[in-house]
Protein backbone atom coordinates (compact mmCIF):
# COMPACT_ATOMS: atom_id res chain seq x y z
CA UNK A 1 0.00 0.00 0.00
CA UNK A 2 1.35 3.39 -0.92
CA UNK A 3 2.09 5.70 1.94
CA UNK A 4 -0.09 8.60 0.92
CA UNK A 5 -2.87 6.22 -0.11
CA UNK A 6 -2.93 5.04 3.50
CA UNK A 7 -3.16 8.51 4.95
CA UNK A 8 -5.48 10.10 2.44
CA UNK A 9 -7.49 7.12 1.26
CA UNK A 10 -8.87 7.62 -2.23
CA UNK A 11 -7.42 11.03 -2.85
CA UNK A 12 -3.98 9.77 -3.80
CA UNK A 13 -4.86 8.05 -7.07
CA UNK A 14 -2.40 8.01 -9.93
CA UNK A 15 -3.37 8.98 -13.44
CA UNK A 16 -2.90 5.34 -14.40
CA UNK A 17 -5.32 4.15 -11.75
CA UNK A 18 -7.89 6.84 -12.46
CA UNK A 19 -7.89 6.10 -16.16
CA UNK A 20 -8.02 2.37 -15.67
CA UNK A 21 -11.69 3.11 -15.03
CA UNK A 22 -12.22 4.20 -18.66
CA UNK A 23 -12.53 2.18 -21.86
CA UNK A 24 -10.69 2.78 -25.10
CA UNK A 25 -12.07 2.80 -28.59
CA UNK A 26 -8.68 2.58 -30.29
CA UNK A 27 -5.00 2.44 -29.53
CA UNK A 28 -4.80 6.20 -29.59
CA UNK A 29 -7.23 7.31 -26.94
CA UNK A 30 -10.21 6.91 -24.67
CA UNK A 31 -13.61 7.62 -26.18
CA UNK A 32 -15.92 8.32 -23.26
CA UNK A 33 -19.03 10.23 -24.33
CA UNK A 34 -19.91 12.76 -21.65
CA UNK A 35 -22.45 15.55 -21.55
CA UNK A 36 -21.46 18.46 -19.32
CA UNK A 37 -24.02 20.99 -18.14
CA UNK A 38 -23.67 23.78 -15.61
CA UNK A 39 -26.81 25.09 -13.92
CA UNK A 40 -27.30 28.79 -13.29
CA UNK A 41 -26.46 28.29 -9.60
CA UNK A 42 -23.09 26.80 -10.53
CA UNK A 43 -23.80 23.08 -10.11
CA UNK A 44 -21.71 21.06 -12.57
CA UNK A 45 -23.44 18.02 -14.06
CA UNK A 46 -21.60 15.24 -15.94
CA UNK A 47 -23.67 12.56 -17.68
CA UNK A 48 -22.37 9.36 -19.31
CA UNK A 49 -24.92 7.07 -20.96
CA UNK A 50 -24.28 3.31 -20.96
CA UNK A 51 -27.02 0.71 -21.41
CA UNK A 52 -25.10 -2.42 -20.46
CA UNK A 53 -26.90 -2.68 -17.10
CA UNK A 54 -30.29 -1.26 -16.00
CA UNK A 55 -28.64 0.75 -13.24
CA UNK A 56 -27.15 4.20 -12.75
CA UNK A 57 -24.07 5.03 -10.69
CA UNK A 58 -24.85 8.28 -8.87
CA UNK A 59 -22.19 10.55 -7.42
CA UNK A 60 -22.29 13.91 -5.68
CA UNK A 61 -18.83 15.32 -5.00
CA UNK A 62 -18.19 18.47 -3.00
CA UNK A 63 -14.87 20.20 -3.62
CA UNK A 64 -14.02 20.37 0.05
CA UNK A 65 -11.79 18.25 2.23
CA UNK A 66 -9.11 18.52 4.85
CA UNK A 67 -7.17 21.17 2.89
CA UNK A 68 -10.04 23.58 3.51
CA UNK A 69 -10.08 23.23 7.29
CA UNK A 70 -9.08 26.06 9.56
CA UNK A 71 -6.03 25.72 11.77
CA UNK A 72 -6.93 23.80 14.91
CA UNK A 73 -9.94 22.09 13.31
CA UNK A 74 -8.41 19.11 11.52
CA UNK A 75 -10.93 16.35 10.92
CA UNK A 76 -13.85 18.75 10.47
CA UNK A 77 -14.61 17.81 6.85
CA UNK A 78 -14.56 14.11 7.72
CA UNK A 79 -16.74 14.71 10.77
CA UNK A 80 -19.26 16.56 8.62
CA UNK A 81 -19.40 13.62 6.22
CA UNK A 82 -20.56 11.46 9.15
CA UNK A 83 -23.16 14.03 10.14
CA UNK A 84 -24.76 14.18 6.69
CA UNK A 85 -26.24 10.74 7.35
CA UNK A 86 -28.10 11.97 10.44
CA UNK A 87 -30.88 13.51 8.39
CA UNK A 88 -32.38 16.82 7.38
CA UNK A 89 -35.31 18.98 8.38
CA UNK A 90 -37.51 16.43 6.57
CA UNK A 91 -35.59 13.18 6.89
CA UNK A 92 -34.79 11.32 10.10
CA UNK A 93 -37.09 13.29 12.43
CA UNK A 94 -40.76 13.33 13.43
CA UNK A 95 -40.97 16.88 14.79
CA UNK A 96 -38.60 19.48 13.34
CA UNK A 97 -39.71 22.22 15.77
CA UNK A 98 -38.94 20.16 18.87
CA UNK A 99 -35.78 18.95 17.13
CA UNK A 100 -34.48 22.51 16.99
CA UNK A 101 -35.26 23.11 20.66
CA UNK A 102 -33.39 19.99 21.74
CA UNK A 103 -30.38 20.92 19.60
CA UNK A 104 -30.23 24.37 21.21
CA UNK A 105 -30.26 22.84 24.69
CA UNK A 106 -27.53 20.36 23.76
CA UNK A 107 -25.36 23.12 22.28
CA UNK A 108 -25.72 25.25 25.42
CA UNK A 109 -24.76 22.34 27.65
CA UNK A 110 -21.73 21.57 25.50
CA UNK A 111 -20.52 25.14 26.05
CA UNK A 112 -20.90 24.64 29.80
CA UNK A 113 -19.08 21.32 29.56
CA UNK A 114 -16.16 22.92 27.70
CA UNK A 115 -16.00 25.72 30.25
CA UNK A 116 -15.94 23.27 33.16
CA UNK A 117 -13.20 21.25 31.45
CA UNK A 118 -11.04 24.37 31.07
CA UNK A 119 -11.55 25.30 34.73
CA UNK A 120 -11.02 21.76 35.95
CA UNK A 121 -14.41 21.90 37.69
CA UNK A 122 -15.05 18.16 37.88
CA UNK A 123 -18.20 18.43 39.98
CA UNK A 124 -19.96 20.77 37.56
CA UNK A 125 -18.63 18.79 34.61
CA UNK A 126 -20.24 15.61 35.87
CA UNK A 127 -23.58 17.36 36.30
CA UNK A 128 -23.50 19.01 32.88
CA UNK A 129 -22.68 15.73 31.16
CA UNK A 130 -25.50 13.93 32.96
CA UNK A 131 -27.93 16.66 31.96
CA UNK A 132 -26.73 16.54 28.34
CA UNK A 133 -27.15 12.77 28.18
CA UNK A 134 -30.65 13.03 29.63
CA UNK A 135 -31.72 15.62 27.06
CA UNK A 136 -30.18 13.61 24.23
CA UNK A 137 -32.08 10.53 25.36
CA UNK A 138 -35.35 12.45 25.11
CA UNK A 139 -34.29 13.95 21.79
CA UNK A 140 -33.68 10.51 20.31
CA UNK A 141 -37.33 9.62 20.80
CA UNK A 142 -38.05 11.94 17.86
CA UNK A 143 -35.54 10.27 15.54
CA UNK A 144 -36.41 8.03 12.61
CA UNK A 145 -33.24 5.99 12.67
CA UNK A 146 -31.39 5.48 9.37
CA UNK A 147 -34.27 6.85 7.32
CA UNK A 148 -32.01 8.00 4.49
CA UNK A 149 -30.25 4.63 4.33
CA UNK A 150 -33.58 2.80 4.36
CA UNK A 151 -34.99 4.95 1.57
CA UNK A 152 -32.09 4.05 -0.71
CA UNK A 153 -32.14 0.37 0.24
CA UNK A 154 -35.88 0.02 -0.32
CA UNK A 155 -35.39 1.54 -3.77
CA UNK A 156 -32.83 -1.16 -4.62
CA UNK A 157 -29.80 1.00 -3.97
CA UNK A 158 -26.39 -0.64 -3.60
CA UNK A 159 -22.97 0.61 -2.59
CA UNK A 160 -24.37 3.47 -0.51
CA UNK A 161 -21.47 5.21 1.19
CA UNK A 162 -19.36 8.33 1.48
CA UNK A 163 -15.76 9.29 2.02
CA UNK A 164 -13.62 12.33 2.71
CA UNK A 165 -10.18 13.08 1.31
CA UNK A 166 -7.99 16.13 1.47
CA UNK A 167 -9.72 17.52 -1.63
CA UNK A 168 -13.25 16.12 -1.78
CA UNK A 169 -16.19 14.82 0.19
CA UNK A 170 -18.11 12.29 -1.89
CA UNK A 171 -21.54 10.71 -1.52
CA UNK A 172 -22.55 7.84 -3.76
CA UNK A 173 -25.00 5.05 -4.48
CA UNK A 174 -26.01 2.92 -7.45
CA UNK A 175 -29.74 2.78 -8.20
CA UNK A 176 -32.07 1.05 -10.64
CA UNK A 177 -32.58 3.29 -13.63
CA UNK A 178 -36.21 4.01 -12.66
CA UNK A 179 -35.24 5.18 -9.14
CA UNK A 180 -32.71 7.90 -9.94
CA UNK A 181 -35.15 10.66 -9.03
CA UNK A 182 -34.84 9.52 -5.41
CA UNK A 183 -31.15 10.46 -5.53
CA UNK A 184 -32.00 13.94 -6.77
CA UNK A 185 -34.58 14.47 -4.03
CA UNK A 186 -32.50 13.19 -1.12
CA UNK A 187 -29.24 14.82 -2.18
CA UNK A 188 -30.73 18.21 -3.04
CA UNK A 189 -32.33 18.09 0.41
CA UNK A 190 -29.02 17.21 2.08
CA UNK A 191 -27.32 19.99 0.15
CA UNK A 192 -29.42 22.68 1.82
CA UNK A 193 -31.32 21.28 4.81
CA UNK A 194 -28.94 18.99 6.71
CA UNK A 195 -29.39 18.89 10.49
CA UNK A 196 -26.33 17.85 12.47
CA UNK A 197 -27.92 15.62 15.08
CA UNK A 198 -25.99 13.55 17.65
CA UNK A 199 -22.84 15.51 16.87
CA UNK A 200 -21.00 14.85 20.12
CA UNK A 201 -21.67 11.10 20.37
CA UNK A 202 -20.58 10.82 16.73
CA UNK A 203 -17.44 12.77 17.57
CA UNK A 204 -16.58 10.01 20.04
CA UNK A 205 -17.12 7.45 17.27
CA UNK A 206 -14.68 9.31 15.01
CA UNK A 207 -12.14 9.54 17.82
CA UNK A 208 -12.36 5.76 18.24
CA UNK A 209 -11.99 5.32 14.48
CA UNK A 210 -8.83 7.39 14.65
CA UNK A 211 -7.50 5.32 17.55
CA UNK A 212 -8.01 2.05 15.68
CA UNK A 213 -6.69 3.21 12.29
CA UNK A 214 -3.74 5.29 13.46
CA UNK A 215 -2.92 5.39 17.14
CA UNK A 216 -3.08 1.63 17.79
CA UNK A 217 -1.94 0.59 14.33
CA UNK A 218 1.71 -0.49 14.01
CA UNK A 219 2.15 1.59 10.87
CA UNK A 220 -0.56 4.19 11.35
CA UNK A 221 1.48 6.80 13.19
CA UNK A 222 4.48 6.07 10.98
CA UNK A 223 2.57 6.94 7.80
CA UNK A 224 1.02 9.99 9.42
CA UNK A 225 4.38 11.29 10.61
CA UNK A 226 6.06 10.52 7.30
CA UNK A 227 3.51 12.59 5.44
CA UNK A 228 3.91 15.46 7.90
CA UNK A 229 7.66 15.21 7.27
CA UNK A 230 7.21 15.17 3.50
CA UNK A 231 4.95 18.24 3.43
CA UNK A 232 6.42 21.11 5.38
CA UNK A 233 3.62 23.67 5.05
CA UNK A 234 0.86 22.64 2.65
CA UNK A 235 -2.18 21.15 4.43
CA UNK A 236 -1.72 17.79 2.71
CA UNK A 237 0.48 17.17 5.76
CA UNK A 238 -2.59 16.93 8.02
CA UNK A 239 -4.49 13.64 8.39
CA UNK A 240 -7.98 13.75 6.94
CA UNK A 241 -9.37 12.15 10.07
CA UNK A 242 -7.77 14.87 12.19
CA UNK A 243 -5.44 14.96 15.17
CA UNK A 244 -6.82 13.50 18.44
CA UNK A 245 -6.90 16.70 20.47
CA UNK A 246 -8.46 18.67 17.63
CA UNK A 247 -11.15 16.06 16.97
CA UNK A 248 -12.29 16.34 20.58
CA UNK A 249 -12.56 20.13 20.29
CA UNK A 250 -14.72 20.11 17.17
CA UNK A 251 -18.15 21.61 17.75
CA UNK A 252 -21.49 21.46 16.03
CA UNK A 253 -21.19 25.19 15.38
CA UNK A 254 -17.89 24.73 13.52
CA UNK A 255 -19.33 21.89 11.45
CA UNK A 256 -22.42 23.93 10.60
CA UNK A 257 -20.22 26.81 9.46
CA UNK A 258 -18.22 24.48 7.20
CA UNK A 259 -21.46 23.05 5.82
CA UNK A 260 -22.96 26.45 5.05
CA UNK A 261 -19.80 27.55 3.27
CA UNK A 262 -18.84 24.54 1.17
CA UNK A 263 -22.00 22.47 0.62
CA UNK A 264 -23.24 24.69 -2.17
CA UNK A 265 -24.14 23.91 -5.79
CA UNK A 266 -21.31 26.04 -7.16
CA UNK A 267 -18.90 23.85 -5.19
CA UNK A 268 -20.44 20.52 -6.21
CA UNK A 269 -20.26 18.05 -9.08
CA UNK A 270 -23.17 15.73 -9.87
CA UNK A 271 -22.17 12.70 -11.95
CA UNK A 272 -24.35 9.96 -13.38
CA UNK A 273 -23.09 6.99 -15.38
CA UNK A 274 -25.36 4.24 -16.60
CA UNK A 275 -28.64 3.42 -18.29
CA UNK A 276 -30.49 6.68 -18.91
CA UNK A 277 -31.09 9.34 -21.52
CA UNK A 278 -29.45 12.63 -20.62
CA UNK A 279 -32.21 14.68 -22.23
CA UNK A 280 -34.78 12.91 -20.05
CA UNK A 281 -32.87 13.38 -16.80
CA UNK A 282 -31.95 17.04 -17.18
CA UNK A 283 -35.49 18.32 -16.42
CA UNK A 284 -35.46 16.32 -13.17
CA UNK A 285 -32.02 17.65 -12.25
CA UNK A 286 -33.27 21.16 -12.89
CA UNK A 287 -36.39 20.49 -10.82
CA UNK A 288 -34.51 19.42 -7.70
CA UNK A 289 -31.23 21.34 -7.86
CA UNK A 290 -31.83 24.55 -9.81
CA UNK A 291 -33.63 26.20 -6.88
CA UNK A 292 -30.80 25.55 -4.41
CA UNK A 293 -29.20 28.96 -3.74
CA UNK A 294 -25.70 29.55 -5.01
CA UNK A 295 -23.10 30.04 -2.31
CA UNK A 296 -20.63 32.85 -2.00
CA UNK A 297 -17.43 32.41 -3.96
CA UNK A 298 -14.61 31.67 -1.56
CA UNK A 299 -10.93 32.36 -1.98
CA UNK A 300 -8.84 29.60 -3.55
CA UNK A 301 -6.08 27.97 -1.55
CA UNK A 302 -3.01 30.19 -1.79
CA UNK A 303 -0.74 28.41 0.66
CA UNK A 304 2.30 26.94 -1.06
CA UNK A 305 4.72 24.19 -0.20
CA UNK A 306 8.25 25.64 -0.02
CA UNK A 307 10.93 24.11 -2.19
CA UNK A 308 12.68 21.29 -0.38
CA UNK A 309 16.18 22.41 0.58
CA UNK A 310 17.65 19.08 1.61
CA UNK A 311 17.14 15.41 2.26
CA UNK A 312 14.64 14.49 4.99
CA UNK A 313 14.68 11.30 7.03
CA UNK A 314 12.31 9.63 9.47
CA UNK A 315 13.19 6.54 11.50
CA UNK A 316 10.47 4.88 13.57
CA UNK A 317 11.34 1.88 15.72
CA UNK A 318 8.68 -0.44 17.11
CA UNK A 319 8.87 -3.91 18.54
CA UNK A 320 5.89 -5.00 16.42
CA UNK A 321 7.14 -3.48 13.19
CA UNK A 322 7.17 -5.15 9.80
CA UNK A 323 10.35 -3.54 8.45
CA UNK A 324 9.95 -1.28 5.44
CA UNK A 325 11.67 1.49 3.52
CA UNK A 326 9.83 4.31 1.77
CA UNK A 327 11.21 7.03 -0.52
CA UNK A 328 9.13 10.02 -1.61
CA UNK A 329 9.75 12.83 -4.09
CA UNK A 330 7.76 15.99 -4.71
CA UNK A 331 6.27 16.25 -8.21
CA UNK A 332 3.95 18.84 -9.77
CA UNK A 333 0.20 18.89 -9.44
CA UNK A 334 -2.28 18.52 -12.28
CA UNK A 335 -1.89 19.68 -15.00
CA UNK A 336 1.75 19.17 -15.93
CA UNK A 337 3.19 17.24 -18.91
CA UNK A 338 5.85 15.60 -16.71
CA UNK A 339 3.11 13.53 -15.08
CA UNK A 340 2.70 11.40 -18.21
CA UNK A 341 6.35 10.36 -18.12
CA UNK A 342 6.04 9.66 -14.39
CA UNK A 343 3.07 7.40 -15.13
CA UNK A 344 5.26 5.46 -17.53
CA UNK A 345 7.92 5.14 -14.83
CA UNK A 346 5.35 3.84 -12.37
CA UNK A 347 4.50 1.02 -14.77
CA UNK A 348 8.15 0.30 -15.53
CA UNK A 349 8.97 -0.06 -11.84
CA UNK A 350 5.78 -1.55 -10.47
CA UNK A 351 4.17 -4.98 -10.46
CA UNK A 352 5.58 -8.49 -10.42
CA UNK A 353 7.07 -7.93 -13.86
CA UNK A 354 8.42 -4.54 -12.87
CA UNK A 355 12.00 -3.64 -12.21
CA UNK A 356 11.67 -3.25 -8.44
CA UNK A 357 10.12 -6.65 -7.85
CA UNK A 358 12.53 -8.44 -10.16
CA UNK A 359 15.52 -6.80 -8.49
CA UNK A 360 14.66 -6.60 -4.78
CA UNK A 361 12.39 -9.64 -4.41
CA UNK A 362 13.48 -12.18 -7.00
CA UNK A 363 17.17 -11.45 -7.57
CA UNK A 364 18.50 -9.95 -4.33
CA UNK A 365 15.82 -11.42 -2.01
CA UNK A 366 15.95 -8.31 0.15
CA UNK A 367 12.21 -7.62 0.10
CA UNK A 368 8.99 -9.61 0.16
CA UNK A 369 7.16 -6.95 -1.84
CA UNK A 370 7.75 -3.63 -3.58
CA UNK A 371 5.63 -0.83 -4.91
CA UNK A 372 5.96 2.38 -6.90
CA UNK A 373 3.32 5.00 -7.42
CA UNK A 374 2.80 8.28 -9.21
CA UNK A 375 0.33 9.81 -6.75
CA UNK A 376 -1.21 12.58 -8.81
CA UNK A 377 -3.28 15.34 -7.24
CA UNK A 378 -4.32 18.93 -7.58
CA UNK A 379 -1.77 21.47 -6.32
CA UNK A 380 1.03 18.97 -5.52
CA UNK A 381 1.78 15.36 -6.37
CA UNK A 382 4.36 12.82 -5.26
CA UNK A 383 6.25 9.83 -6.58
CA UNK A 384 6.67 7.06 -4.04
CA UNK A 385 8.66 3.85 -3.73
CA UNK A 386 8.43 1.23 -1.02
CA UNK A 387 10.00 -2.06 -0.06
CA UNK A 388 8.75 -4.45 2.64
CA UNK A 389 11.87 -6.21 3.90
CA UNK A 390 12.67 -9.88 4.20
CA UNK A 391 13.43 -10.99 7.75
CA UNK A 392 17.06 -10.30 8.57
CA UNK A 393 17.58 -7.78 5.78
CA UNK A 394 18.66 -4.20 6.46
CA UNK A 395 16.98 -0.94 5.45
CA UNK A 396 20.35 0.35 4.24
CA UNK A 397 20.57 -2.39 1.61
CA UNK A 398 16.96 -2.00 0.49
CA UNK A 399 17.33 1.76 0.14
CA UNK A 400 20.53 1.35 -1.84
CA UNK A 401 18.85 -1.07 -4.26
CA UNK A 402 15.86 1.23 -4.73
CA UNK A 403 18.28 3.99 -5.60
CA UNK A 404 20.16 1.80 -8.05
CA UNK A 405 16.92 1.35 -9.99
CA UNK A 406 16.25 5.09 -9.92
CA UNK A 407 19.76 5.79 -11.16
CA UNK A 408 19.22 3.29 -13.94
CA UNK A 409 16.20 5.31 -15.10
CA UNK A 410 18.31 8.46 -15.00
CA UNK A 411 21.32 7.04 -16.85
CA UNK A 412 19.79 4.55 -19.31
CA UNK A 413 16.85 5.37 -21.57
CA UNK A 414 14.00 2.88 -21.26
CA UNK A 415 14.16 0.58 -24.28
CA UNK A 416 11.52 1.00 -26.93
CA UNK A 417 10.56 -2.63 -26.36
CA UNK A 418 9.96 -2.09 -22.64
CA UNK A 419 8.12 1.13 -23.33
CA UNK A 420 5.82 -0.59 -25.82
CA UNK A 421 5.18 -3.36 -23.30
CA UNK A 422 4.04 -0.75 -20.79
CA UNK A 423 1.80 0.89 -23.37
CA UNK A 424 0.23 -2.47 -24.22
CA UNK A 425 -0.49 -3.08 -20.55
CA UNK A 426 -2.17 0.29 -20.29
CA UNK A 427 -4.22 -0.30 -23.44
CA UNK A 428 -5.39 -3.68 -22.10
CA UNK A 429 -6.39 -2.26 -18.74
CA UNK A 430 -8.55 0.36 -20.44
CA UNK A 431 -10.24 -2.04 -22.87
CA UNK A 432 -12.28 -3.86 -20.21
CA UNK A 433 -12.65 -1.18 -17.55
CA UNK A 434 -15.48 0.79 -19.13
CA UNK A 435 -17.87 -1.87 -17.83
CA UNK A 436 -17.60 -0.45 -14.31
CA UNK A 437 -19.97 2.50 -14.25
CA UNK A 438 -19.32 3.18 -10.57
CA UNK A 439 -15.65 3.71 -11.31
CA UNK A 440 -16.38 5.76 -14.41
CA UNK A 441 -18.59 8.09 -12.37
CA UNK A 442 -15.92 8.58 -9.71
CA UNK A 443 -13.22 9.09 -12.32
CA UNK A 444 -15.19 11.83 -14.05
CA UNK A 445 -15.84 13.60 -10.77
CA UNK A 446 -12.18 13.53 -9.78
CA UNK A 447 -10.97 14.89 -13.09
CA UNK A 448 -13.53 17.67 -13.02
CA UNK A 449 -12.24 18.65 -9.59
CA UNK A 450 -8.69 18.43 -10.91
CA UNK A 451 -9.76 20.93 -13.54
CA UNK A 452 -10.64 19.05 -16.72
CA UNK A 453 -12.68 15.85 -16.98
CA UNK A 454 -11.84 15.62 -20.70
CA UNK A 455 -8.35 14.44 -19.80
CA UNK A 456 -9.84 10.95 -19.70
CA UNK A 457 -10.19 11.18 -23.46
CA UNK A 458 -6.67 12.50 -24.00
CA UNK A 459 -4.57 10.67 -21.45
CA UNK A 460 -3.76 7.56 -23.43
CA UNK A 461 -2.75 9.63 -26.44
CA UNK A 462 -0.48 11.76 -24.24
CA UNK A 463 1.12 8.70 -22.66
CA UNK A 464 1.65 7.20 -26.10
CA UNK A 465 3.69 10.25 -27.07
CA UNK A 466 6.17 9.83 -24.20
CA UNK A 467 9.63 8.94 -25.50
CA UNK A 468 12.53 7.18 -23.76
CA UNK A 469 14.41 10.48 -23.74
CA UNK A 470 11.52 12.19 -21.95
CA UNK A 471 11.36 9.45 -19.32
CA UNK A 472 15.08 9.85 -18.70
CA UNK A 473 14.89 13.65 -18.50
CA UNK A 474 11.99 13.62 -16.04
CA UNK A 475 13.73 11.02 -13.88
CA UNK A 476 16.82 13.23 -13.75
CA UNK A 477 14.70 16.23 -12.84
CA UNK A 478 12.87 14.80 -9.83
CA UNK A 479 14.88 11.83 -8.54
CA UNK A 480 17.64 13.61 -6.64
CA UNK A 481 18.91 12.55 -3.23
CA UNK A 482 18.81 16.10 -1.94
CA UNK A 483 15.09 16.15 -2.75
CA UNK A 484 14.11 12.82 -1.22
CA UNK A 485 12.16 12.08 1.94
CA UNK A 486 13.10 8.67 3.34
CA UNK A 487 11.20 6.65 5.92
CA UNK A 488 12.43 3.60 7.79
CA UNK A 489 9.99 1.57 9.87
CA UNK A 490 12.17 -0.93 11.67
CA UNK A 491 12.28 -3.06 14.83
CA UNK A 492 13.10 -1.42 18.12
CA UNK A 493 16.64 -1.86 19.35
CA UNK A 494 17.00 -4.47 22.06
Model-assigned labels for residue ranges:
Residues 11-23:
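Bacterial N-terminal signal peptides
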Residues 74-86:
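Active-site recognition of the HExxH zinc-binding catalytic motif
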Residues 48, 53-69, 76-77, 93-189, ...:
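M16 family metallopeptidases and their MPP-like homologs
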Residues 190-198, 207, 211-215, 230-241, ...:
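An aromatic/glycine/proline-enriched structural segment found at the starts
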Residues 1-9:
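N-terminal secretory signal peptides that target proteins for export/translocation
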Residues 4, 25-47, 269, 277-317, ...:
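Proteolytic maturation boundary segments
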Amino acid sequence: MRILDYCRALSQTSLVALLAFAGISSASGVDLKVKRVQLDNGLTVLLHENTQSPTVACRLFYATGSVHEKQGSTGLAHMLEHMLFKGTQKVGITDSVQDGKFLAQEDNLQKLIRGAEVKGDTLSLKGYKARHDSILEEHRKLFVKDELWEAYLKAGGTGLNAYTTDLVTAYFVTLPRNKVELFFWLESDRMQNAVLREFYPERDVVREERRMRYDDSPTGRYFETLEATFYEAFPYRNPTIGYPSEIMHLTREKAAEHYRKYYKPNNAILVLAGDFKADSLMPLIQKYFATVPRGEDFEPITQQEPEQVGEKRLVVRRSDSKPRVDILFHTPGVPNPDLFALDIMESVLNGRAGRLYRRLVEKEQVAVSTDAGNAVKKYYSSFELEAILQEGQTPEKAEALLWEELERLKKEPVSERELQKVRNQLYASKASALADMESVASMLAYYEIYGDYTLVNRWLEEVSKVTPAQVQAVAQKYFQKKLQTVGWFIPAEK
